[in-house]
Amino acid sequence: MELNKNLIIPFAKQAGLTSFASMSAVKKALSTKKVGHTGTLDLFADGLLVLLTGQLTRLADIISAEKKTYEAWVEFGTETDTLDPEGEPVLTAPLPSYKNLTESIPSFLGKILQRPPEFSAIKINGKRASDRIRSGEKIKIAEREIEIFKIELKGIITDSGLEFTEKDFTNINAELKIRYAHIVVECSKGTYIRSLVRDLARKASSCAYVRALRRTAVGNFKLEDAAGFDLLNNFSAAPENLFLKEKKILDAAAGKKFYKQKEIDFLEIMAKSIIFSPKTAENLKLPYLFLDRKYLNDFYNGKKIKFNWFLNTDEVLENITGLDLENKKTCVFCGDLWIGIIGLNKNCPKYETVIKN
C-alpha cells in the first residue's frame, strides 16, 4: 500500500540536533525529501516541531503564525555570548532576589520591543547573523515588536541549592537569591526566549542565559502528542537533565564530537501523523472556508474570488478581528478536499495557493 505523503507530523526534536537534521527520520519513514517545519528550534533546545510533508508544506505560514509555548531553565549570575549553554561567558553579575525577579516579570507582558540575539538565524543581507558574528563582523539587529501572553514562574533553585516549586511561593523569603528559575512562556511568533531571559535578568539587576529550552505547544499542537515525546528527558527534574556541552561524545572515526540521539520508531511517526481535513482544521482552530462545489472550476481557473463562493463566510469573518483581517491566510476546502489557501481581507480575497487534486 502506498504511503500518504501529505501529512502533518507533530515531532519531538531532541537537544543537540538542528531542526533540519531532525527531519531526517521523517524523510526516511516516508521516503520523501519534501518535508518542512513551522519554526526552527535552537540546537540546544528540544521540543515540538510541527512537520509538514508533500503539498502540506504550503501550510507553513499559517501554522508558524500561531502562538508558541516554551519551558525554560534560566541560570542567573552569568551571561554567555550566545545566551545559551553553547556559548562563552561574557558577563557576570550578582544573583537576583526572588522579590526582584517576580517584580520584573510584569514589565514583559503584552506587546513589547525585543532585540533578537546576535547569534541567531536572522538574515542580514542574505547571510545569517550568527555566521557574520563568527566571521568577525560587528552587527546590530533591530528591535522588533513581539507579544508575551504569559510568563509563569514554576520553580526556583537558590544559591544554596534549596528547591522551591510554585506551591511554596506563598510563604517564601523574598530576599532569597536565585541561581536557577524554571519558567513557562506563551508568546507570539518571532519571540526569542534567549532575548527575553537576557532582558528579564537585567531588569532584575542580574544577568542570565537559557540553560535548557523546550517548546511545548504551537497553537493547538501539543508536545505530548508528538512522535518521540517519550524519548525526551523529564524537563522538571533539574539540574541533572539540563543541556550540557559535556553531553557530546567523541566519534573517533570522524574525529569530532556529536550529540548522541535516540532512534524514533517508524510506526510511531506514522501513528502520530495527521491527515489534513476540515475536522483537523477545526480541532487545531485554523481558519478555513468551504467552497460551494459549483464554483470549483472558477477557483481552479483563478477567477476573481467572491465572498458568495463560500458557504461559511459570515462565520469565519465573525471570528477574525479587524486587525487580523489584512490578508489573513485561510484554508479552503471543497467538501473534505483541501484545495488551497486564500488571503482573506475585507475587500478582495486573493489566491495564495491552489491545490489541484
From Swiss-Prot:
InterPro entries: PsdUridine_synth_cat_dom_sf (IPR020103), PsdUridine_synth_N (IPR002501), tRNA_psdUridine_synth_TruB (IPR014780). It catalyses: uridine(55) in tRNA = pseudouridine(55) in tRNA. The gene is truB. Its EC number is 5.4.99.25. It holds the Pfam family TruB_N. Belongs to the pseudouridine synthase TruB family. Type 1 subfamily. The keyword Iron-sulfur does not apply. The active site is at 42 (nucleophile). CDD domains: PseudoU_synth_EcTruB. Keywords: Isomerase, tRNA processing. One of its GO terms (biological process) is mRNA pseudouridine synthesis. GO terms for molecular function: RNA binding; tRNA pseudouridine(55) synthase activity. The keyword Transcription does not apply. It comes from the Bacteria. This is tRNA pseudouridine synthase B.
